[in-house]
Amino acid sequence: GDTRRQIL
């Protein structure tokens, strides 16, 4: 997944 941003 994307580790560039944190999605809660």
From Swiss-Prot:
It is found in: Secreted. It catalyses: an N-(acyl)-sphingosylphosphocholine = an N-(acyl)-sphingosyl-1,3-cyclic phosphate + choline; an N-(acyl)-sphingosylphosphoethanolamine = an N-(acyl)-sphingosyl-1,3-cyclic phosphate + ethanolamine; a 1-acyl-sn-glycero-3-phosphocholine = a 1-acyl-sn-glycero-2,3-cyclic phosphate + choline; a 1-acyl-sn-glycero-3-phosphoethanolamine = a 1-acyl-sn-glycero-2,3-cyclic phosphate + ethanolamine. Expressed by the venom gland. Its cofactor is Mg(2+). It comes from the Eukaryota. Keywords: Cytolysis, Dermonecrotic toxin, Hemolysis, Lipid degradation, Lipid metabolism, Lyase, Magnesium, Metal-binding, Secreted, Toxin. Its main location: secreted. One of its GO terms (biological process) is killing of cells of another organism. Coiled coil: none annotated. It is an enzyme of class 4 (lyase). Its EC number is 4.6.1.-. Binds 1 Mg(2+) ion per subunit. GO terms for cellular component: extracellular region. Signal peptide: none annotated. GO terms for molecular function: lyase activity; metal ion binding; toxin activity. Dermonecrotic toxins cleave the phosphodiester linkage between the phosphate and headgroup of certain phospholipids (sphingolipid and lysolipid substrates), forming an alcohol (often choline) and a cyclic phosphate. This toxin acts on sphingomyelin (SM). It may also act on ceramide phosphoethanolamine (CPE), lysophosphatidylcholine (LPC) and lysophosphatidylethanolamine (LPE), but not on lysophosphatidylserine (LPS), and lysophosphatidylglycerol (LPG). It acts by transphosphatidylation, releasing exclusively cyclic phosphate products as second products. Belongs to the arthropod phospholipase D family. This is Dermonecrotic toxin LgSicTox-LOXN5. It comes from Loxosceles gaucho.
